[in-house]
UniProtKB/Swiss-Prot annotation:
Keywords: Amino-acid biosynthesis, Aromatic amino acid biosynthesis, Cytoplasm, Transferase. Phosphoenolpyruvate binds at residues 23, 96, 124, 169, 344, 385, 410. GO terms for biological process: amino acid biosynthetic process; aromatic amino acid family biosynthetic process; chorismate biosynthetic process. SUPFAM superfamilies: EPT/RTPC-like. This is 3-phosphoshikimate 1-carboxyvinyltransferase. Monomer. The gene is aroA. Pfam families: EPSP_synthase. Catalyzes the transfer of the enolpyruvyl moiety of phosphoenolpyruvate (PEP) to the 5-hydroxyl of shikimate-3-phosphate (S3P) to produce enolpyruvyl shikimate-3-phosphate and inorganic phosphate. The active site is at 311 (proton acceptor). GO terms for cellular component: cytoplasm. 3-phosphoshikimate binds at residues 23-24, 28, 167-169, 196, 311, 340. Residues 426-450 are annotated as: Disordered.
Length: 450
């Protein structure tokens, strides 16, 4: 496999970047559109949808279940019924949202549906969701990929207890389909911790936007009443998690990066993202339709609990590795990342140490002591976030090569182009002002149709 030489920015990066739509919001909107269509409410439109491997897998899954998806690029329409054909088989790839959101949908069908995925996906946690479906009366063969869901045309619902310590997607997957259950659904989380809670809040917010009656006022308990799921137009926000890699470029280079389309009010965990950037002495400026981050001249190590936003861990670990030499950062609340696309804690520790850094695992996180890094290969482990972390390291360390930049197709197929356009031909442009006759670079992922 050909490696990707990560561009280096010997001077501060100055750029405006447009990132495509949110993967998390796109796939939730697609599931809700499918449920609305299956209830006979009509077609829904998704505008600004992300087109990436994860969302293509979701589109394929819905079509496998018998639904119809029309449109090109980022404008999609979902209609039809849940009527899977004989031998229906859903490919989950490495997409956790497909793996955990689609089985409850399949339970509403009337024929068995087999689920499988990439070899690497077979280690991802799924048993608690399958056990919950069994508790609700669904026949399920298997405890992990591959498994088979035997739909019988309806699902009574009721109350289910589930340990979602390994993934908040277990809860979201049940809640998304719950309004179509005869008696609705009450979900009680029984585990000691709940990672990525803002993503459950996103699910609840989008259910309300679809007219679903959901009560999440009691911690670790959610109640969805049976009723209609409205067909509607979904306008997808830019993917703020993907934007963090680009904003990190401003932090590590002392430059300025502006993200277009940053929402004033978001269903994504925007506040958590901005709090981390401010902790690193970055200046965050909101405009009407953008967010600008001005990086510091330097920053020390930091302590941060990433339980709510574990997806940010690879980017934050890269920032920690590039902090002031000798300073120590502690990343906590992320034990669940051992069950993500790869064991992200082990992968980050291995790769930072491979480049001469000092990183060790703890029971629920990482401790990183910033030391000068050297050139070398950064392995991505087929993980999009790991590939992006290698790109961040490469901004400051010449000679870093990412072994599998194509892993970014999972959520951002345009990443290599956007990154190169942001950095420019071998270097960034100075902050606070570009040189005479020059303008800040602009990188956009819109209109690609991905």
């Amino acid at each position: 496999m050909k490696t990707w030489p990560a561009p280096t920015a010997p001077t501060p990066v100055r750029a405006t970047v447009t990132v495509p739509g949110s993967k998390s919001q796109t796939n939730r909107a697609l599931v809700l559109a499918a449920l609305a269509a299956a209830q006979g409410r009509g077609a829904s439109t998704i505008s600004g949808a992300l087109r990436s491997r994860d969302t293509e897998l979701m589109l394929d899954a819905l079509q496998t279940l018998g639904l119809r998806v029309d449109g090109v690029g980022s404008e999609l329409t979902v209609s039809g019924r849940i009527e899977p054909g004989p031998g229906a088989r859903v490919d989950c790839g490495l997409a956790g949202t497909v793996l955990r959101f689609v089985p409850p949908l399949a339970a509403l069908g009337s024929v068995p549906v087999t689920f499988d995925g990439d070899q690497q996906a077979r280690g991802r946690p799924i048993a608690p969701l399958l056990d919950a479906l069994r508790e609700l009366g669904v026949a399920v063969d298997g405890t992990g990929l591959p498994f088979r869901v035997h739909g019988n045309g309806s699902l009574a619902g009721g109350t289910v207890a589930i340990d979602a310590s390994a993934s908040s997607q277990f809860v979201s997957g049940l809640l998304l389909s719950a309004a179509s259950f005869t008696d609705g659904l009450t979900v009680q989380h029984t585990g000691s911790s709940l990672p990525s809670a803002p993503h459950i809040a996103m699910t609840a917010a989008m259910l309300r936007q679809a007219g679903v009656d959901i009560d999440d006022s009691t911690p670790n308990r959610w109640q969805v009443r049976p009723g209609p799921v409205a067909a509607r137009r979904w306008d997808i926000e830019p993917d703020l998690t993907n934007a963090v890699a680009f904003l990190s470029a401003a932090v590590v280079s002392g430059g300025t990066v502006r993200i277009t389309g940053w929402p004033r009010v978001s269903v994504q965990p925007a506040d958590h993202i901005l709090a981390i950037l401010r902790q690193l002495n970055a200046v965050v400026i909101h405009a009407d339709s953008s967010l600008e981050v001005r990086g510091p001249t330097g920053y020390d190590g930091f302590d941060v609990d990433l339980r709510a936003v574990g997806e940010l861990t690879p980017s934050v670990a890269a920032l920690a590795a590039l902090a002031s030499p000798g300073s120590v950062s502690r990343l906590s609340g992320i034990a669940h990342l051992r069950g993500h696309e790869t064991d992200r804690l082990a992968a980050l520790s291995t790769e930072i140490n491979r480049l001469g850094g000092t990183c060790r695992e703890t029971p629920d996180g990482l401790v990183i002591t910033a030391t000068p890094l050297r050139p070398g290969i950064w392995r991505a482990y087929a993980d999009h976030r790991m590939a992006m972390a290698g790109a961040i390291i490469g901004l400051r360390v010449a000679g870093v090569e990412v072994d599998d930049i194509a892993a970014t197709t999972k959520t951002l197929p345009e990443f290599p182009r956007l990154w190169a356009e942001m950095v420019g031909p071998g270097q960034g442009w100075g902050y606070p002002q570009p040189r005479s006759g020059q303008r800040a670079r602009r990188a956009t992922g819109q209109g690609s149709g991905g």
